[in-house]
Amino acid sequence: MPPGRRRYAEIINSEGEGGSLPQAEIGIIGGSGLYNLPGIERVREVRVATPFGRPSDAYRLGNLEGRKVAFLSRHGRGHTLLPTEVNSRANIYGFKKLGVERIISVSAVGSLREEYRPMDMALPAQFFDRTRQRASTFFGGGLVVHISFDTPVCPTVVEVLAGACKDLGVRCHAGGTYVCMEGPAFSTKAESNVYRSWGMDLIGMTSLPEAKLAREAEICYATLAMVTDYDCWHPQHDAVTINMVLEYLTHNVENSQKILLRAIRAMPQPRSCKCASALAHAILTDRTRISSTARKKLSLLVGKYLG
C-alpha cells in the first residue's frame, strides 16, 4: 500500500478505535501556495472523517513559529471544486476535530471601490450573503441553534493581521463589507453597480458560509482578502478574467506568506474573545427534546452545553 494511503488508513483506524488525531491551534484555509510556508517543520497530512462528508482535501499539519498549525486547500489541490461544491461544513468541522481555535481564511476578491486597488490586502469587518445553494449551518434535525452574527469576524485575529500588514509595509484596508456571491460566473455590470450602490466594498465567492460555520463551531475567524481586480464596474479597467486573477494571486502569494508568518507568531493565547462561547446562549431546543441521534452527531460542538 502506498505510504499516503497507509497513513490515511492508520488515522481512520485510530479514530474508529477511540484514538486521537494530531492537534493544531491555528487553521489556514487557502490555496496550495500557502501549504509550504518557510520554516514549517514536522509536516504531516491527515484526512479527517466528519458527519458532514469529506473535507476538500487532507489537512496539512506542522509546527510554525512555535505554534501548531493546520492548512487546508479550500478548492482541493489542483483546484477541482467550484465555490458551490466546497463542503464548508466538513472543512470547518474537521478543523474543530483537530482542536483548531482560530482560522485565517485567505481568498481572492474583487474591489468595488476605487481605493481598494489590485495587490492591496483587505480585512473585511462585515459580510453580505448572496449565496443560494450552500448549507450554512451544522444544526437542524431536532436541534435548533441561533448564533449572534452581528460581528462576523474575530476582532483579535483581525487586529493581529492588521498589525502584521503594518509591520511589513503592506497596503491593507481594515474594515468594509465583503459581498459573497454564489458564482462561478463573475458579476454582470448591473450586479457590480448595484453592490456598489448598496455600499459593498469587496466581492468574492468563498467567505460564506465559512464564517457562519466557524462561529457555530466557536472558532475565531477572519478573512485575509487579496484584491485582484475591479470586478467589472470600473470604466478604466478591463472586466475581471481568470487570467487577471491568477496573475495578481501569483504576485501576492509572497506577501500572504509573510503576513501569515508574522500573524501566527503574534497570535495571543489564551483566547479572550466571545467567539469561544458563541453557543452559550444560542441553543433554543428544550434539552429534554433533543434526540440521542442529534446529541451524538453534534456532541463535538454542543456537548459541553448539554451535559
How does the language model describe each region?
Residues 15-151, 305-307:
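Metabolite-binding pocket within alpha/beta catalytic cores that recognizes anionic/polar moieties
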Residues 156, 160-171, 258-266:
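Generic non-transmembrane alpha-helical segments
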Residues 167-201, 288:
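Active-site/ligand-binding-proximal alpha/beta "capping" segment
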Residues 205-243:
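Zn-dependent metallopeptidase/amidohydrolase metal-coordination segment
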Residues 232-279:
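His/Asp/Glu-rich mid-to-C-terminal helical/loop segments that flank catalytic regions of hydrolases
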Residues 272-307:
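A short, charged, Gly/Pro-tolerant segment at domain boundaries
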